[in-house]
Amino acid sequence: MFPMVTGFMNYGQQTIRAARYIGQSFMITLSQANRLPVTIQYPYEKLIPSERFRGRIHFEFDKCIACEVCVRVCPIDLPVVDWKFETDIRKKRLLNYSIDFGICIFCGNCVEYCPTNCLSMTEEYELATYDRHELNYNQIALGRLPMSVIDDFTIRTVLNSPQRKNV
């Protein structure tokens, strides 16, 4: 008869322990319920990238001296620099500059080591296309500045959202 009594005591202790664990997890869930959501509705709301964000590369054709430092410091030898040596002025003349963003790892070495600062990182991160060949940007596509996220009236940033203003 004693094993039966100890079995009921163990069952009672296990039931109390299970109820306590359920109560603790329920309290944790309730404490998280009154927080603001961390996720955003991406196509309609966008986060503002930080200052050091490494997005699409912006290229200024007039500043480039065709030194090819960007190609040498790139871990995957990505930038394609076509130039012609002008014998009368004894300088290189840049003909074409292109970067394939389908292969680029956005390390920022080309921007950091460029002696004339003709390369810079923008805050543009939406580079999705249906064809991977459209990710090969030449000097014309690299020279366009991206439209700012804040200027687009169809997109609300997290700082400008109506939910944020009410709180």
UniProtKB/Swiss-Prot annotation:
Domain spans labelled 4Fe-4S ferredoxin-type: 55-84, 95-124
EC number: 7.1.1.-
Cellular localization per UniProt: Plastid, Chloroplast thylakoid membrane
Keyword Ribosomal protein carried by entry: no
GO molecular function, one term: iron ion binding
Cofactor comment text: Binds 2 [4Fe-4S] clusters per subunit.
UniProt xrefs under Pfam families: Fer4_7
Keyword terms of this UniProt record: 4Fe-4S, Chloroplast, Iron, Iron-sulfur, Membrane, Metal-binding, NAD, NADP, Plastid, Plastoquinone, Quinone, Repeat, Thylakoid, Translocase
InterPro entries with a match to the protein in the record: 4Fe4S_Fe-S-bd (IPR017896), 4Fe4S_Fe_S_CS (IPR017900), NADH_quinone_OxRdtase_chainI (IPR010226), NDHI (IPR004497)
Family: Belongs to the complex I 23 kDa subunit family.
UniProt subunit comment: NDH is composed of at least 16 different subunits, 5 of which are encoded in the nucleus.
Name of the protein this chain belongs to: NAD(P)H-quinone oxidoreductase subunit I, chloroplastic
Organism: Citrus sinensis
